[in-house]
Amino acid sequence: MYIKTREIGTGCIGGKAAGMLLARNILRDEAPELYSSRIEPHDSYYIGADVFYTYAVQSGLWGSRIHMIEAEDYLKYAPDIRELLLNGTFAPSIKEQFMSMLEYFGQSPIIVRSSSILEDGFGNAFAGKYESVFCPNQGSLKERYDVFERAVKQVYASTVDPDALKDRAERNLL
């Protein structure tokens, strides 16, 4: 499965997502019997990193985020940025792609997972610092969309969690 056919927006995907795809390809090539008999078909979508950046700019928090990163007392800005991340607005084109994905999955449950370059890029592993959110994905398309959008925003907001910020600061990744 090609990433581009399952990517919402554009931009890089994180280390966990890339690693999962790489592992599947290695198994497919090196152990085809195991791959075909034991590995379930891959069925994920990826939200490109540019969606986060666009969301941050459109939601009016990019300047605040930059100010936080440059501040010595960066943790004091995190709660305000978290609120902005939870209450921002996605571009109409991204909303349409979210809707298409939800229509594709029907009412099957979805997990929104973080897979950022900062969180789990090569040499920067600190997996588990950002949230993963389970979406039951039940109800009308509008209800499912609202829950899914909230889940994505919650994962985005977890990027300014104090523990995540401290870990990133220790690695000079703010």
Predicted regions, residues:
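Nucleotide/phosphate-binding sheet-loop regions of phosphoryl- and nucleotidyl-transfer enzymes
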Residues: 1-174
